[in-house]
Design a protein with these regions (language model features):
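Glycine-rich phosphate-binding loops that contact phosphosugars or nucleotide phosphates
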Residues: 41-175
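Short hydrophobic/aromatic-rich motifs at helix boundaries and adjacent loops
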Residues: 7-9, 32-35, 79-80, 137-139
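Residue-identity detector for glutamine
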Residues: 7, 25-27, 34, 103, ...
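HTH-adjacent hinge/linker in prokaryotic transcriptional regulators
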Residues: 1-32
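Residues that form generic nucleotide/phosphate-binding pockets
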Residues: 20-24, 39, 170
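Glycine-rich phosphate/diphosphate-binding loops that line cofactor/substrate pockets in enzymes
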Residues: 31-43
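A short, charged, Gly/Pro-tolerant segment at domain boundaries
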Residues: 174-182
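Secondary-structure transition/capping residues
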Residues: 32, 47, 178-179
């Protein structure tokens, strides 16, 4: 049996999760997801970018999107040279809790300048990454930092994984030019 002190702690943690799942049931959230899907269906390849915890989620997102038939890859090194030429058929999904990570902003801006559409998934809508994006999906969960040290960000990525899987499922079965690769 769980003690009342332990139960209270669990309930506090679940409040943020519950709030997030209530927000995803809104019409505005559904429209935001559809806007992202519309941008992605115009692309022949999808690039995920992020640093730190977001880079690992980007790798997961790329794998998930490949599983549903969309050619995707993750750039986990922010100093990777950006392709030369035009990127009209490329979509970028930039992941960042703060939306202010310098390396992610730099890479997203380079890709956008090359013609890539830019979808960002951030914790808040009023951040630099969201403002430069063609579409921003924000999730508003409580940020959790170990001892308030920026190097130990323990903010839950559950919302980001849910959003990526939701978009991936929407893309499943939608025809794109990479269908012959799979």
């Amino acid at each position: 049996e769980v003690s009342s002190k332990e139960q209270k702690k669990i309930n506090m943690d679940l409040t943020a999760v519950k709030d997030f799942f209530e927000r995803v049931q809104t019409q505005a959230f559904a429209e935001n997801i559809q806007e992202a899907v519309k941008l992605l269906t115009k692309a022949s390849s999808i690039i995920f970018v992020g640093v730190g915890n977001s880079s690992f989620i980007g790798k997961y997102g790329a794998r998930y999107f490949n599983n549903v038939g969309w050619f995707s890859f993750a750039i986990d090194d922010p100093f990777t040279p950006v392709f030369r030429g035009k990127g009209e058929r490329i979509a970028t999904i930039a992941l960042s809790v703060s939306g202010e990570t310098e390396q992610t902003l730099m890479l997203a801006e380079k890709l956008k300048r090359r013609g890539s559409s830019l979808i960002s998934i951030t914790n808040k809508a009023n951040c630099s990454l969201a403002k430069m994006s063609d579409c921003n999906i924000n999730y508003y969960v409580s940020e959790y930092k170990y001892k308030q040290d920026e190097d130990y960000d323990l903010t839950s990525q559950m919302a980001v994984v849910f959003i990526l899987e939701l978009i991936g499922r929407e893309l499943k079965g939608v025809h794109n030019d990479t269908d012959d690769l799979f």
